[in-house]
Regions:
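Transmembrane-helix motifs of polytopic, lipid-linked glycan transferases
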Residues: 21, 87-118, 161-168, 416-419, ...
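Start-transfer (signal-anchor) and selected internal transmembrane alpha helices
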Residues: 1-30, 95-98, 116-130, 267-270, ...
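Transmembrane-helix signature of polytopic, membrane-embedded enzymes
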Residues: 18, 22, 100-138, 173-180, ...
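Transmembrane signal-anchor helices characteristic of membrane glycosylation enzymes that use polyprenol
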Residues: 12-41, 136-139, 196, 322-342, ...
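Membrane-interface alpha helices of multi-pass inner-membrane proteins
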Residues: 50-53, 132-134, 181-194, 231-233, ...
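Membrane-interface transmembrane helices that cradle and orient dolichyl/undecaprenyl
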Residues: 113-123, 162-182, 208-222, 257-271
């Protein structure tokens, strides 16, 4: 019998693979030439020291990074141990550039109809992909993260890979291969939390592809993306004492119920249950602990209903996702195990008891208020958080990623990315709209979530909301990376527009 998976696959594109390898190689060489030869300021020294002795750094512990760091520390390819551990970021960020190339070409490939091939279609995709990959590689903040022992290089490599895998799932939806891509995505996402929570930022957008059935229409994708955008607007609406998180939860429940009423026939409910359980880790690990149990009960109930009522609820897929997510998150059990051996660096001593371990993962030492609740208590003026302001303003970081600071220099790059996003939405809404939503979540959404302090809302009684002590540009690296990809798509869109005009003439 013919292999059903093989019949669904496209011919292997050697040129595409070679160019992906070339983008990786160019990025790797540039990073290797500019990598720090010893440790850098802030967290880098702590991570290197912990990697060398398998210690426990500040919460939430970054266990996967520490374990990988130990592997690099014992390989004597350069003399200084700090120099060795820095190469985690060098290699990871080179992979980020490579996956950015693959994601850019994947988006561009949906500009064209396969039934009407043109010799220049692939060439346009290759040019846009290389441009996108190198825009990502050489954006200022990403480059800075790529040459020191920080968690963001590895986190970004996983993030971009997850989005690429999600689109591959969408292309093969309804096949066994697609389910394998989805399970791999959930595993990498939960494993990536062991590097940094930033990895999970892309998962809600990836879930749009996962939870909708094969017969979903472009309107269904648009509705879910619109829901996510409205959520961001509601955070702004209810912030600063205008209702707070309770009103936000209530409004979200109402809108969510309405959305489900519109889409319930085209939703894979078992996947939704598993996703909600895994996504609860963004609230806290304590919440995830409860949701894991609740979701397992719901899926078992779906299994019983499926057999007795002869329904196709795909409960096995839901349980598999739930299990693989737990396996990924289980990397954090390294923390109490190693802490129990009393290494020289053992912050918070998380092996003391289960409660201490959970508080460590939930970063309780930084305050008892959850990050979600903190979003609704403004710690800075909107114009400072979104505009130009020392240590925190999003636009002040964005405008210097590919040019000198200043509106004049950033306008061409901004317009290029805008063209890319608009064209992606116009050509294939099912891909373009989630991609645009992803950029909003990693830019505006992250600005709202982090709620950086500018010093104007300082609380003299609690000491909270003092001005950020250092530049926070690294938190916005995902936004800069995805905008770099959008610029690559924009170049391809302009090239294709010129081709069409010349063909018509």
């Amino acid at each position: 019998l013919p292999d059903p998976l093989k019949s669904q696959s496209e011919p292997f594109d050697r040129t595409n693979a070679a160019l992906a390898g070339l983008v990786f190689l160019i990025s790797f060489v540039v990073y290797a030439l500019t990598v720090q030869k010893t440790f850098s300021f802030w967290d880098c020294g702590e991570f290197i020291a912990c990697a060398n002795i398998l210690g426990i750094p500040h919460p939430p512990g970054t266990p996967l990074f520490v374990i990988l760091g130990r592997v690099f520390a014992i390989i004597p390819f350069v003399e200084d141990i700090s120099h060795r551990v820095n190469y985690i970021s060098v290699i990871s960020s080179a992979f980020t550039a490579m996956f950015a190339y693959l994601l850019t070409t994947k988006i561009i490939s949906h500009f064209f109809h396969k039934e009407d091939p043109h010799p220049l279609h692939k060439f346009i995709g290759y040019v846009g992909g290389v441009a996108g990959g190198l825009f990502v590689a050489w954006s200022r903040t990403n480059w800075a993260n790529s040459v020191e022992a920080e968690v963001y290089g590895l986190a970004l490599a996983l993030s971009v890979a997850l989005v690429w895998l999600a689109i591959k799932f969408w292309e093969n939806k309804g096949t066994l291969k697609a389910n394998r891509w989805m399970i791999l995505c959930f595993y990498l996402a939960t494993l990536g939390i062991g590097v940094h929570m930033t990895v999970f930022l892309v998962v809600p957008v990836c879930a749009i592809f996962f939870i909708l059935r094969k017969d979903a229409t472009p309107r269904d994708y648009l509705l879910i993306c619109a829901f996510a955008i409205v959520e961001l607007l509601m955070i702004i609406l209810f912030a600063d004492g205008r209702g707070g998180h309770k009103f936000f939860y209530f409004a979200t429940a109402l809108l969510g119920a309405g959305l489900l009423a519109l889409l319930y026939k085209r939703i894979q409910w078992a996947v939704v249950v598993a996703f909600v359980s895994i996504a609860s880790v963004m609230m806290s690990f304590s919440t995830y602990e409860k949701m894991l149990f609740v979701s397992a009960i719901i899926l078992v109930g779906m299994a019983i209903a499926s057999k007795r009522l002869n329904l196709e609820l795909k409960w096995k897929l839901g349980l598999t996702i739930l299990l693989i997510g737990f396996v990924g998150i289980s990397v954090h059990f390294f923390i109490p195990i190693r802490s129990g051996q009393n290494p020289r660096i053992d912050e918070n001593n998380p092996s003391r008891d289960w409660r201490t371990f959970k508080n460590f993962l939930d970063r309780r030492q930084y305050g008892q208020q959850s990050m979600v609740e903190r979003m609704f208590v403004r710690r800075g003026a909107w114009e400072n958080q979104l505009g130009r302001h020392p240590h925190m303003g999003f636009w002040s970081y964005f405008e210097e990623q590919w040019s000198k600071p200043g509106v004049t220099f950033i306008i061409p790059f901004f317009l290029l990315g805008l063209v890319g996003m608009v064209t992606a939405i116009y050509k294939r809404l099912e891909i373009g709209m989630p991609f645009f939503t992803l950029f909003l979540l990693t830019s505006l959404g992250l600005t709202l979530y982090m709620n950086f302090a500018d010093g104007t809302h300082y609380n003299f009684q609690t000491g909270d909301a003092y001005m950020e002590v250092r530049n926070r540009d690294y938190f916005f690296t995902p936004a800069f990376v995805f905008f770099g990809i959008a610029m690559g798509v924009g170049i391809a869109a302009i090239m294709n527009y010129i081709r069409e005009k010349l063909s018509n003439n």
